[in-house]
Swiss-Prot record:
Molecular function GO labels: DNA binding; DNA-binding transcription factor activity
InterPro entries: TBP, TBP_archaea, TBP_CS, TBP_dom_sf
GO biological process, one term: DNA-templated transcription initiation
SUPFAM superfamilies xrefs: TATA-box binding protein-like
S-S bridge residues: none
Organism from which the protein derives: Pyrobaculum islandicum (strain DSM 4184 / JCM 9189 / GEO3)
Gene: tbp
Spans of repeat Sequence: 10-86, 101-177
Family affiliation: Belongs to the TBP family.
Identification of the protein by name: TATA-box-binding protein
PANTHER family hit by this protein: TATA-BOX BINDING PROTEIN
Keyword set, alphabetical order: DNA-binding, Repeat, Transcription, Transcription regulation
Length: 199
């Protein structure tokens, strides 16, 4: 990859976990000091882990939603920690429940300005209405993600199901925009900008 190519960072992974058993949330709430449970306001029990920093919404049906992971490894570790916590406090949940990533959100930078007016004319499944939203919305078919592209070169990727999908989508987008001639890469512009900030 040439210098000034795209970069990205995963902001959030949302996954569902099927524990396969019904849970007594009242009993768990009594036993787990860090649990938040107010069934009048929300039907699920909320647990927040600090390492990795993840929130889990646990429902009576045995379904669990995990949010906040920054990578798939953190997600796996969090699910293991949650399963251990639930088992240690009387819930007979399986050691290795079914985990399914529902959505990965990543932010990124193409390190080049984008001519959105031209890009929307050349990309299939793209929409750009600057009066309503400053970014171009591009529905990529493979991998199946939605990219928000801003004139500054900043991007947001949503809908990915794996970290590999994010990496593939970001690089593919960069290559497409470059091939279409709508990316404006300033050679050496970054160094000049840094020097100006220091003054």
């Amino acid at each position: 990859m040439e210098s000034g190519g795209p970069t990205y960072r995963i902001e959030n992974i949302v996954a569902t976990v099927n524990l396969g058993v019904e849970l007594d949330l009242e009993k768990l709430a009594e036993r787990l000091a860090m649990a938040e449970y107010n069934p009048d306001q929300f039907p699920g029990l909320i647990l927040r882990l600090t390492k990795p920093r993840i929130s889990a919404l646990i429902f009576r049906t045995g379904k669990m939603v995990c949010t906040g992971a920054k990578n798939e490894e953190d997600l796996k570790n969090a699910v293991r920690a949650l399963v251990k916590l639930l088992r240690d406090h009387g819930a007979e949940v399986p050691f290795d429940p079914e985990v399914q990533v529902q959505n990965i959100v990543a932010s990124g930078n193409l390190h080049a300005e984008v001519d959105l007016e031209q890009a929307v004319l050349m990309l299939e499944n793209a929409m750009y209405e600057p009066e309503q939203f400053p970014g171009l919305i591009y529905r990529m078919s493979s991998p199946r993600v939605v990219m928000l592209i801003f004139g500054s070169g900043k991007i947001v990727c949503t809908g990915a199901k794996s970290e590999r999908d994010v990496a593939t989508a970001v690089q593919k987008l960069y290559n497409q925009l470059k091939d279409l001639g709508v990316l404006y890469i300033e050679e050496g512009g970054g160094e000049e900008e840094e020097e100006l900030e220091e003054l």
